[in-house]
UniProtKB/Swiss-Prot annotation:
Subcellular location, record wording: Cytoplasm
Chain positions recorded as ATP binding sites: V18, G60, V61, G62, K63, T64, E65, D246, E311, R383
InterPro entries found in the cross-reference section: AAA+_ATPase, ATP-dep_Clp_protease_ClpX, ATPase_AAA_core, Clp_ATPase_C, HslU, P-loop_NTPase
GO cellular component assignments: HslUV protease complex
Family recorded in the similarity comment: Belongs to the ClpX chaperone family. HslU subfamily.
GO biological process, one term: proteolysis involved in protein catabolic process
UniProt KW keywords: ATP-binding, Chaperone, Cytoplasm, Nucleotide-binding, Stress response
Protein purpose: ATPase subunit of a proteasome-like degradation complex; this subunit has chaperone activity. The binding of ATP and its subsequent hydrolysis by HslU are essential for unfolding of protein substrates subsequently hydrolyzed by HslV. HslU recognizes the N-terminal part of its protein substrates and unfolds these before they are guided to HslV for hydrolysis.
GO-annotated molecular function: ATP binding; ATP hydrolysis activity; peptidase activity; proteasome-activating activity
The protein's name: ATP-dependent protease ATPase subunit HslU
Subunit structure: A double ring-shaped homohexamer of HslV is capped on each side by a ring-shaped HslU homohexamer. The assembly of the HslU/HslV complex is dependent on binding of ATP.
Upper classification of the organism: Bacteria, Pseudomonadati, Pseudomonadota, Alphaproteobacteria, Hyphomicrobiales
């Protein structure tokens, strides 16, 4: 679990996300509280429960982006999922306990990657021996093997093709056991049943350099204790897991609607025990959800947070409102973040040998058009900038391979020429922008 301070988390998020200081503070405090709880001892540690968060704000203001960036910072099992994917237990569809099964799989992969690094040196030696076996045969003399080992380490043989035996992945078709739907153990892979028994292999023809990664992973997995790995992954989920539940406003039952809706109120009821704390059975073992942090988010355009079940509202005690984006925010989004849209397009065109030069008045014009279209058609926040940029740079993107070595100056006049009329015509922009 990461031990960086809330201030450092906020400054890291500031590199990629413009504004929304309240939301950044809330998630940074929640993340730090995970670490604080780990420092406690005795029964008090079990009593400290995470304070789940509800983010409320219009679409395209940074709710999902905060979650994405938080996942990279957290160094903990993280799952982002849409609430609309689920149906009430007993109906065809995914039940909410699948959230826990999915985050356990994420944690197992994370833990395996971390542990592979610990045994990488031994795995590399074992992989090297297998490559040498493929090159000179298992019965070659020590002198021959040493000679080839030197050439192998110098990179001389990287492009040489060899045949290696590799383990087949434990995939295969998935099915559910009748009478035991996803609520019990989830879909079972045939590989889970038969894969461990025979240890099936297949012969593959690869270059030496391509074979290394596959063989190192295989040899690493042989050195790992799979039971211990699973236990560590489950412990990581139970203590540090973070679930980002997007589109929670879409499962609200709005006033005046009647009739059954299996993916709305029923899903809310099923979420209650999961967020409050329950034990979920997975194929890897039982997982307790008491200390998993849930961050829910929704635009709440039509529904209101008060349309959620009162019990669910009580389980999301921290409310954070994200502000709608202003013209100044949109202007900053175009230029300030490390991976801003303008930097992305400049880098993309640079691969074709075309230099894009954006002037300040072009940035102003792009922001003005995005604001104008958002106000007349539908406010989709910063996502509108992508549509506007694509439209402005459409001609350059198409002709770039023929313009190698050119420098294209993008100013306000260029922007207006390519998109100005569309932005003014509300009917056209409704369909094109």
């Amino acid at each position: 679990m990461t031990d960086i301070s809330p201030r450092e988390i906020v400054s890291e998020l500031d590199r990629f996300i413009v504004g929304q200081a309240d939301a950044k503070r809330a998630v940074s405090i929640a993340l730090r509280n995970r670490w604080r709880r780990q420092q406690l001892t005795g029964p008090l540690r079990e009593e400290v429960l995470p304070k789940n968060i509800l983010m409320i704000g219009p679409t395209g203001v940074g709710k999902t982006e905060i979650a994405r960036r938080l996942a990279k910072l957290a160094n903990a099992p993280f799952l982002k999922i849409e609430a609309t994917k689920f149906t009430e237990v007993g109906y065809v569809g995914r039940d909410v306990e699948q959230i826990v099964r999915d985050i356990v799989e994420v944690a197992i992969n994370q833990t395996r990657e971390r542990k592979r690094k610990d045994v990488q040196a031994r795995a590399q030696l074992a992989a090297e021996e297998r490559v040498l076996d493929a090159l000179v045969g298992a019965n070659a003399s020590a002198a021959t093997r040493d000679s080839f080992r030197k050439r192998l380490r110098s990179g001389e043989l990287n492009d040489k093709e060899i045949e290696i035996e590799t383990q087949t992945s434990g995939g295969g078709p998935m099915f559910e056991i009748p009478g035991m739907p996803g609520a019990q153990v989830g879909a079972i892979s045939i590989g889970d049943i038969f894969g461990k028994m025979g240890g099936r292999t297949k012969t593959r023809r690869l270059t030496v350099s391509d074979s290394y990664e596959i063989l190192i992973n295989e040899e690493s997995d042989k050195l790992l204790d799979s039971d211990q790995l699973t236990q560590e992954a489950i412990a990581a989920v139970e203590n540090n897991g973070i679930v980002f539940l997007d589109e929670i406003d879409k499962i609200c039952v709005r006033d005046g609607r009647s009739g059954g809706d299996v993916s709305r109120e029923g899903v809310q009821r099923d979420l209650l025990p999961l967020i409050e704390g329950t034990t979920v059975s997975t194929k890897h073992g039982a997982v307790k959800t008491d200390h998993i942090l849930f961050i829910a988010s929704g635009a709440f355009h039509i529904a209101k947070p008060s349309d959620l079940l009162p019990e669910l509202q009580g389980r999301l005690p921290i409310r954070v409102e994200l502000d709608a984006l202003t013209r100044d925010d949109l202007r900053r989004i175009l230029t300030e973040p490390e991976a801003s849209l303008i930097k992305q397009y400049v880098a993309l065109m640079d691969t074709e040998g075309v230099v894009l030069d954006f002037t300040d008045d072009a940035v102003d014009a792009l922001a003005d058009i995005a604001v104008a279209v958002n106000s007349t058609v539908e406010n989709i926040g910063a996502r509108r900038l992508q549509t506007v940029m694509e439209r402005v740079l459409d001609d350059i993107s198409f002709t770039a391979p023929d313009r190698n070595g050119e420098t294209v100056r993008i100013d306000a006049g260029y922007v207006q020429k390519n998109i100005g009329d569309l932005a003014k015509n509300a009917d056209l922009s409704r369909f094109i922008l």
